[in-house]
From Swiss-Prot:
Record PROSITE patterns: ANK_REP_REGION, ANK_REPEAT
Domain of life: Viruses
Keywords per UniProt: ANK repeat
Keyword Iron: no
Upper classification of the organism: Viruses, Varidnaviria, Bamfordvirae, Nucleocytoviricota, Pokkesviricetes
Species, as recorded: Vaccinia virus (strain Copenhagen)
Protein name: Ankyrin repeat protein C18/B24
Keyword rRNA-binding: no
Length: 150
């Protein structure tokens, strides 16, 4: 499937390719038992769509019920790929976050190598993780006096 997501049809540009891929997927999805099926490398279709930064295909997979928590490295991959974009750095990250990954998925994303990445996608994930953390308001009250004193 990775080759299908990466390959481009010869006679049309990228936009045409994306449309054809989504049309083919719409037809094939009727015959799929599990949209989150995992290949022999433990990766899902959503992982591959994120890996090649195919936002429209990732969005379609999510609309069909693909889970952002099935493959633990999806969020981390999105953060890394977003860091290489010149424009709309957080677009793929924001898309994935809009489908509510679990706090465990967010923690796992930050347990991977993120040292050399641009801050925008990281900040989006941190904001989302803080929203999920039930204890965060109490942590803010502990941090605020320290910030005010300095």
């Amino acid at each position: 499937m990775y080759g299908l997501i990466l390959s481009r049809f010869n006679n049309c540009g990228y936009h045409c390719y994306e449309t054809i891929l989504i049309d083919v997927f719409d037809i094939l999805s009727k015959y799929m038992d599990d949209i989150d099926m995992i290949d022999n490398e433990n990766k899902t279709l959503l992982y591959y769509a994120v890996d090649v930064n195919n936002i429209q295909f990732a969005k379609r997979l999510l609309e069909y019920g693909a889970s952002v928590t099935t493959s633990r490295s999806i969020i981390n991959t999105a953060i890394q790929k977003s860091s290489y974009q010149r424009e709309n750095k957080t677009r793929i990250v924001d898309l994935l976050l809009s489908y509510h990954p679990t706090l465990e998925t967010m923690i796992d994303a930050f347990n991977r190598d993120i040292r050399y990445l641009y801050p925008e996608p990281l900040f989006a994930c941190i904001r989302y993780a803080l929203i999920l953390d039930d204890d965060f308001p109490s942590k803010v009250s502990m941090i605020s006096p320290v910030i005010i004193r300095n």
